[in-house]
Every structure is written in structure tokens, then in C-alpha cells.
């Protein structure tokens, strides 16, 4: 059932933030669940919920939107192709396989509490009208889940090898070094910002702000762009700009990064802009959702998953901000956002079994 459902879901050309009708399709697939659509500026979110008993409130979450397919595919990106044990289509790994797995598990599994499915079509883009709107609604009606599994593709080499219990934060910034433009033949009459930053760049690029912790790697300043001048050989630039990103751990915050950079740049004429684009989060490894999902993964796959926080940001951070114990688990992520994206059919079936086992044994 889950594979056929996934194929139908992959047919929807749901390029972010357009769900292309996929959310209605999912809602109709689960007629026993109460459906609540939350829409703003043409962007849709869907909350499906069902009360089975007096037990705890468990949720699954995911996004149906995908990035544009781009060129160079060997098949039509929105016509799923089954070949050699894989399904090829845009969104097959990221993350319609995860959505299909928990939707089908919710349809078949028995539960003792309240089960919710929280879906958005605004994750791959800005996310302005996505998951946070759905969570704000649930908070207003006092119906936030206690636990949530976000079915992002998390596994690395082998299905079952990785559960994300957190994510690093993301800090973006820009440094502008001020100089005085002039003729290269008269360097004594110029203040070249390239010369100013050259001896300091090694203190910025790839600098570790901390030594990392149990679940987080060090917070490293990564320079992403350096530019200045007019692309000519006989004029020194009036300024030079450096853009950077820091994926920060629990040991470093935006103020730490700003203070460090200002100490390095002390004495120069410069401007610094910096902001926390997304917050880091970490769910306690002893949380019930972590322990139970680990048990289900090991039971179904025979693999003991590693708890980690690797990778970029995801919507799990929003759940954490609302006080929900959130973790992530899904298929292998070796083809996400790539041409000829594909997912293993075996992994899809196993993911469905993991989620079904988690639901039925969540007590």
C-alpha cells in the first residue's frame, strides 16, 4: 500500500510553496481523521488528527513541497519511474517517502492516545507561511502534541543508522571592510581593504568558536563569499565584503560570534551585520520519543541508530520552539535535491513498518 500511495503522491507537481492538490489528496485518504486546513497567502498547511484513547498526543510531520527539478533528468521528474528496486522522481527522498510512510502507518495502526499528522507545503522555500502557522494554531486551541517525529531523510549509509535528535542553529553575517579607492600606481595614496583583511582572514575563515559537545560538532565560521572592486586591474577597491555562516552548537550563540569578530577587526574601519537565521535545538536522549523510536528502528531493521545533529535546518526546530519533543527519522539522503532523485522501495516499506510499530507500541 505505501509504495502505491507514494507513487500517487509523487505525481503532484508540488514545487514550493504550491501543494498542487496533494494535501487534499492526503486528507481524502484518511477520512477517519479530522482535517483542518490552515492557509495564508495561498500557502496551505494541513493538520489531521484522531483520538483513539486517553493516551499521549503523538504527531508526525513533514512537507509535501519540493525544490524545482532542474534539467538533465533521465526520466520525467513528476512521473515516478520504478527501476531496479528504486523509485525515481522529484521528492522521492525529500520527503514524500517519509510522508507516505507515516500517512499509511496512521491509516493502519492502532493507538492508545491522540495521533496528529502535521503537513506543510512551505518548507523548501522561505517557510514564512508553513509549519509555524500550524503550530501557532495548535497552541491557541491548546492542542500541541507532546512528541513529534519529522520524517525527513536522515539516514547516511544504511537505512536505520541515524536519528536526528537536534539540529545546529544557523547564523548569517556580512563584514564590509572600508578603504580608500585609488590608482594602483600610487598605492601610498590608497587604503586597500584587501591588504587590511589579508593578515586577519585566517582568524576568521574556518575558525572554530568552540570545541563541540556530545551531540554537536564545533561551531565553525565558514566564509561563503568575498568580493570587492570593479573587476579591473588598475583600481584598488573602496571596500571589500565578506559573507559568512556559522552552524552553531549549544556552546556558541550569535553574541559570541559578534564579539569574536569585533575583536579580530579591532582598529579597522568596518561594518558588521549578523543575525540568527534559525535556532538550534536538542531533544533529550532520554525522552520517550527517542527511546521508543530507537527500539522500533532496531526491531524492524536490526540496526542500532546513531543519535546525532548533523545536517542543515529542518522544521523540527519549530516544534522544539513550541515545547514539543521533536526528532527526525527517514530514508537515506544520498540523492536529495539532486537530478535523478530516487528512493529505495525496500527503505520505504521498512520506514512504514518502523512508524507503524512506533505508533502501536507507544505506551
Curated annotation (Swiss-Prot):
Its cofactor is Zn(2+); Co(2+). One of its GO terms (biological process) is L-arginine biosynthetic process. It comes from the Bacteria. Its EC number is 3.5.1.18. Keywords: Amino-acid biosynthesis, Cobalt, Diaminopimelate biosynthesis, Hydrolase, Lysine biosynthesis, Metal-binding, Zinc. The keyword Transit peptide does not apply. Pathway: Amino-acid biosynthesis; L-lysine biosynthesis via DAP pathway; LL-2,6-diaminopimelate from (S)-tetrahydrodipicolinate (succinylase route): step 3/3. Zn(2+) 1 binds at residues 63, 94, 152. One of its GO terms (molecular function) is succinyl-diaminopimelate desuccinylase activity. The active site is at residues 65, 123. Zn(2+) 2 binds at residues 94, 124, 337. Belongs to the peptidase M20A family. DapE subfamily. Catalyzes the hydrolysis of N-succinyl-L,L-diaminopimelic acid (SDAP), forming succinate and LL-2,6-diaminopimelate (DAP), an intermediate involved in the bacterial biosynthesis of lysine and meso-diaminopimelic acid, an essential component of bacterial cell walls. Homodimer. This is Succinyl-diaminopimelate desuccinylase.
Amino acid at each position: 500500500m505505501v509504495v502505491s500511495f507514494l507513487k500517487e503522491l509523487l505525481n503532484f507537481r508540488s514545487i514550493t510553496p504550491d501543494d498542487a492538490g496533494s494535501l487534499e489528496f492526503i486528507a481524502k485518504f484518511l477520512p477517519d481523521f479530522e482535517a483542518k486546513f490552515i492557509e495564508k497567502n495561498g500557502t496551505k498547511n494541513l493538520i489531521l488528527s484522531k483520538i483513539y484513547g486517553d493516551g499521549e498526543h503523538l504527531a508526525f510531520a513533514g512537507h509535501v513541497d519540493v525544490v524545482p527539478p532542474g534539467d538533465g533528468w533521465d526520466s520525467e521528474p513528476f512521473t515516478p519511474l520504478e527501476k531496479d528496486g528504486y523509485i525515481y522522481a522529484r521528492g522521492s527522498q525529500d520527503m514524500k517517502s517519509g510522508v507516505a510512510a507515516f500517512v499509511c502507518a496512521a491509516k493502519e495502526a492502532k493507538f492508545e492516545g491522540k495521533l496528529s499528522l502535521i503537513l506543510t507545503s512551505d518548507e523548501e522555500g522561505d517557510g514564512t507561511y508553513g509549519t509555524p502557522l500550524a503550530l501557532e494554531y495548535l497552541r491557541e486551541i491548546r492542542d500541541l502534541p507532546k512528541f513529534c517525529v519529522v520524517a525527513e531523510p536522515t539516514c547516511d549509509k544504511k537505512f536505520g543508522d541515524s536519528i536526528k535528535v537536534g539540529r545546529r542553529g544557523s547564523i548569517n553575517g556580512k563584514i564590509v571592510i572600508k578603504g580608500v579607492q585609488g590608482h594602483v600606481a600610487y598605492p601610498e595614496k590608497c587604503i586597500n581593504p584587501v591588504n587590511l583583511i589579508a593578515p586577519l582572514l585566517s582568524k576568521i575563515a574556518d575558525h572554530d568558536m568552540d570545541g563541540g559537545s556530545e551531540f554537536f560538532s564545533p561551531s565553525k565560521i565558514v566564509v561563503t563569499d568575498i568580493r570587492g572592486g570593479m573587476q579591473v586591474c588598475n583600481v584598488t577597491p573602496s571596500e571589500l565584503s565578506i559573507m559568512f555562516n556559522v552552524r552553531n552548537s549549544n556552546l556558541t550563540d550569535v553574541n559570541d560570534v559578534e564579539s569574536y569578530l569585533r575583536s579580530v577587526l579591532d582598529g579597522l574601519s568596518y561594518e558588521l551585520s549578523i543575525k540568527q537565521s534559525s535556532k538550534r535545538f536538542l531533544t533529550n536522549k532520554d525522552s520517550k520519543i527517542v527511546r521508543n523510536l530507537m527500539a522500533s528502528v532496531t526491531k524492524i531493521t536490526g540496526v542500532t541508530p546513531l543519535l546525532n545533529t548533523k545536517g542543515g535546518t529542518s522544521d523540527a526546530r519549530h516544534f522544539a520552539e513550541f515545547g514539543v519533543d521533536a526528532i527526525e527519522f527517514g530514508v537515506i539522503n544520498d540523492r536529495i535535491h539532486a537530478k535523478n532523485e530516487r528512493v529505495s522501495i525496500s527503505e520505504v516499506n521498512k520506514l512504514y513498518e518502523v512508524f507503524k510499530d512506533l505508533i502501536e507500541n507507544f505506551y
